[in-house]
Amino acid sequence: MPKLKTRKAALKRYKKTGAGNFLRRHAYKGHLLMKKSNAQKRKLSQRVCVSSGDSKPIKLMLPY
């Protein structure tokens, strides 16, 4: 049986934790940052866990 391929786009966007959850970055942090406050930019810099409903397709894209 051939090996399962990893979706490289998902590999760049998500990081797997030890508990099996996935971490993702916030949106709205790429450009147009002058109008955002420092507190908002600092909050957007943190990583957040992917919701349980969205994690099932990510598990299929990242088999290893």
From Swiss-Prot:
Please provide the record's keywords in A-Z order: Chloroplast, Plastid, Ribonucleoprotein, Ribosomal protein
Q: What's the family?
A: Belongs to the bacterial ribosomal protein bL35 family.
Q: Which PANTHER family does the UniProt entry name for this protein?
A: 54S RIBOSOMAL PROTEIN BL35M, LARGE RIBOSOMAL SUBUNIT PROTEIN BL35M
Q: Which InterPro entries match?
A: Ribosomal_bL35, Ribosomal_bL35-like, Ribosomal_bL35_CS, Ribosomal_bL35_sf
Q: Which Gene Ontology BP annotations are present?
A: translation
Q: Report the principal subcellular site.
A: plastid
Cystine residue pairs: none
Q: Any idea what this protein is called? A: Large ribosomal subunit protein bL35c
State the gene name recorded for this protein: rpl35
Pfam families assigned to the protein according to its UniProt record, in alphabetical order: Ribosomal_L35p
Subcellular compartments: Plastid, Chloroplast
- Show the GO cellular component annotation of the record: chloroplast; large ribosomal subunit
Any single GO molecular-function term of the entry would be: structural constituent of ribosome
